[in-house]
């Protein structure tokens, strides 16, 4: 799984976050994993 702070996509195309949450703001190319 992807560690917190590393890049991710909410749709899971780059893998799943260890925390289970990918934070992505509108307009961002990619998000990052973090705790919810």
From Swiss-Prot:
Localization annotation: Secreted
GO cellular component term of the entry, any: extracellular region
Keywords noted in UniProt: Antimicrobial, Disulfide bond, Fungicide, Knottin, Secreted
Main location: secreted
Disulfide pattern: 1-18, 8-22, 17-33
Top-level division of the source organism's lineage: Eukaryota
Tagged with keyword Electron transport: no
Pfam assignment, any one: Antifungal_pept
Gene Ontology terms describing biological process: defense response to fungus; killing of cells of another organism
Homology family: Belongs to the AMP family.
Role, per record: Has antifungal activity against C.glabrata.
Domain remark from Swiss-Prot or TrEMBL: The presence of a 'disulfide through disulfide knot' structurally defines this protein as a knottin.
Protein name: Antimicrobial peptide Alo-3
Organism annotation: Acrocinus longimanus
